[in-house]
Design a protein with these regions (language model features):
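Conserved small-residue-rich beta-alpha loop and adjacent elements
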Residues: 110-175
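C-terminal core of ALDH-fold dehydrogenases
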Residues: 324-431
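Glycine-rich phosphate/diphosphate-binding loop of Rossmann-like nucleotide-binding domains
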Residues: 141, 152-168, 244-252, 256-294
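A glycine- and small/hydrophobic-rich beta-loop-beta segment
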Residues: 259, 263, 271-348
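N-terminal Rossmann-like NAD(P)+-binding subdomain of aldehyde/semialdehyde dehydrogenases
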Residues: 1-125
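Short acidic-hydrophobic, aromatic-tinged amphipathic segments that line or gate anion-handling sites
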Residues: 3-8, 184-189, 308-315
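Conserved NAD(P)+-binding/catalytic subdomain of aldehyde/semialdehyde dehydrogenases
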Residues: 181-268
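Buried hydrophobic positions in well-ordered alpha/beta secondary-structure cores of metabolic enzymes
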Residues: 45, 128, 150, 214, ...
Length: 431
């Protein structure tokens, strides 16, 4: 049985605090291994990529054709999809693109009361690297969620790296790459791929920003290379918090909880409800549904290790504070009127409003990005957006009159800070 925490019990605060503080990131000590891989790629370039790709993926980068997946191959993968699946990917891409186009910031250019011209210009980075995992996490939706905002932002060069164990590439991922319009796809994965994107090699030219999910080695590589390049975030295991009253169908809520549990054994699913009987019904339905899932083994491991049910007396009064402390990646508000909860909860990666808005629809076709902060990082960070592929340059301009209005204050502050050259730069113009 998974833990059930009752908010009215004396030991609730201690138990909830342990839940908040628990870490689910992989405990493997990968830091040293990743440091070694990064150094090897930085110093040995393509030769290191050949070695690591053979060792980890069982794939030889022997000839030029072995290194890249052609854009023609991506186009063929798209054309060969079943029509209904092709239409679903197209719909997802259209909605993702429309949502992110609405995020584009506006440049500013104005003259203030002192006559100083001020403003800012937004520009896209030149090149972005998109990491696409192989194996269990080879999701075409993730490629769309990373590549489309970059293209909307105006990035000119989109580079995908993806491991292809034994040379096999996921055709759905290739089809998504065709839809998103990526420019290059390299058959390289792991920390070594992140290093290649950051440092560049003879074959793979460096990029400015790296985004995309990956395993512990990929996440650690991004962490270590932040500053050499920009990154989206250091992501951990997926998580969902469902706030639900007893008016819900317990089957629906059970399925929503399992939508994250099936991702990985370290994923976490939490239910907050104000009805203990409903909580028991949901638990029963979780057990039934796990037995029906092809991903049941993973979901069972996740639910048994990290699933939690919290029973409160008043959802409106108690759930927001608990949700803020959890700062979950996904928060579902399965109640009649989710608006008060939406505005009361300050820390969440993405919020899903009402009984007809399961998290799964946001993963694919709603439009908002599904690359979201995990591990309580929603307290200080946001989901992926066009801004992750852009930077802002401020500008200012003064004439003689406006310089006379504000220059003396600048000189006084420079003297106060003990920087006479700064002061002289201003004072010479004031004479």
């Amino acid at each position: 049985m998974i833990p059930i925490l009752y908010a009215n019990q004396p030991d609730f605060e201690a138990k909830f605090a342990r839940l908040v503080e628990a870490r689910r990131e992989t405990d493997s000590n990968v830091t040293g291994q990743v440091t070694s891989i990064l150094h090897s790629v930085k110093t040995r370039g393509d030769a290191a990529l050949v070695e690591f790709t053979q060792r980890f993926d069982g794939y030889g980068l022997a000839s030029d054709a072995d290194w890249q997946i052609s854009l023609d191959e991506c186009a063929r993968a798209y054309a060969e999809l079943p029509e209904d699946l092709r239409e679903a990917l197209d719909l997802a891409a259209q909605r993702i693109r429309a949502y992110h186009e609405a995020q584009l910031p506006e440049n500013r250019d104005y003259v203030d009361a002192s006559g100083v011209r001020l403003g800012a210009i937004w520009r896209a980075v030149d090149a972005a690297g998109l990491y696409v995992p192989g194996g269990r996490a080879a999701y075409p939706s993730s490629l769309l969620m990373n590549a489309i905002p970059a293209r909307v932002a105006g990035v000119e060069r989109l580079v995908v790296t993806t491991p292809t164990p034994r040379g096999e590439a996921n055709p759905l991922v290739l089809a998504a790459a065709h839809i998103a319009g990526v420019d290059e796809i390299w058959r390289v994965g792991g920390a070594q791929a992140v290093a290649a994107l950051a440092y560049g090699t003879d074959r793979i030219k460096p990029v400015d920003v790296i985004t995309g999910p990956g395993n512990a080695w990929v996440a650690e590589a991004k962490r270590q290379l932040f500053g050499v390049v920009g990154i989206d975030m250091v992501a951990g295991p997926s998580e969902i918090l469902v706030i639900a009253d007893a008016k819900n169908d317990p089957d629906w809520i059970a399925a929503d909880l399992l939508s994250q549990a099936e991702h990985d054994p370290t994923s976490q699913s939490i239910l907050i409800t104000d009805d203990a009987g409903f909580a028991a019904q949901v638990e029963d339905r979780v057990d039934v549904q796990i037995a029906q899932l092809a991903t049941g083994k993973t979901a069972r491991a996740s639910w048994d290790a990290h699933g939690v049910v919290i029973v409160v007396e008043d959802l409106a009064a108690q759930a927001p504070a608990l949700a803020d402390r959890l700062a979950a990646e996904h928060v579902e508000l399965a109640v009649d009127d989710p608006e008060p909860l939406l505005h009361a909860i300050r820390h969440a990666g993405s919020v899903f409003l009402g009984r007809m808005t399961p998290e799964a629809v946001g993963d694919y076709v709603a439009g908002p990005n599904h690359v979201l902060p995990t591990g309580r990082r929603a307290r200080f960070s946001s989901g992926l957006s066009v801004l992750d592929f852009m930077k802002r340059t401020s500008f200012l301009g003064l004439d003689e009159a406006s310089f006379g209005a504000i220059g003396p204050a600048a000189a006084r502050l420079a003297h106060a800070e003990g920087l006479p050259a700064h002061a002289k730069s201003v004072e010479l113009r004031l004479k």
